[in-house]
Amino acid sequence: MFRKQLRRIKVYFLKFIRTSGSPHKIALAVAIGFFIGCIIPIGIWGQTVVAIILAIKFKTNPGIAYAATWISNPYSVLVLYPVFCFVGSRVIGSDLSFHYIEKRFVQLMHNFSWDSLLNLGSYFACSFFVGAFIFGIIIGVLGYFITYALISEYKKRKMARIITKRQKKNS
């Protein structure tokens, strides 16, 4: 089963790498997806809609932008969201401790309701969105540069292979 999962990851990675478009456009789509994936909480359909609209606006690949929003998924939010809240609380000057934030998130995850979410309070929400915005920018920028480097390198190697093949064919 583990090999099957690795194979699936490899297939999707190769599809991503082989996507048509300039390295800038592909990297920009990843950056948009990462940013939106951080600042809009999961479970809200707006994450998908906003990522696709921004991708279209910036003339990038909406599919890649949508896929990149999955940086926040049910598994990663268990780590990301408390970190967002902690960093945001430090920026806005709130005294929320990481232990308190983590404890409240665990309670919320085990017994979710909209009332319990609203009862977290405005400081909690404000610290979340400030931290998410900061991390969204950082992760988006990192995602852009890493993706740009990977795609550029892949396209250079691909072009070198094509040139080498043509030279062998012509000689």
Model-derived features: positions:
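Transmembrane alpha-helical segments in integral membrane proteins
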Residues: S127-S152
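Juxtamembrane non-transmembrane "cap" segments at the membrane-aqueous interface
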Residues: V83-F112
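Helix-loop-helix hairpins and the membrane-proximal interhelical loops
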Residues: M1-P23
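Transmembrane helix boundary and interhelical junction motifs in multipass membrane proteins
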Residues: I39-I53, K57-A67, S72-F84
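Membrane-water interface at transmembrane helix exits
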Residues: G33, G37, A55, S72, ...
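Short, highly charged, low-complexity non-transmembrane loops/tails of multi-pass membrane proteins
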Residues: Y154-S171
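Transmembrane alpha-helical segments and their cytosolic interface motifs
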Residues: G21-I44
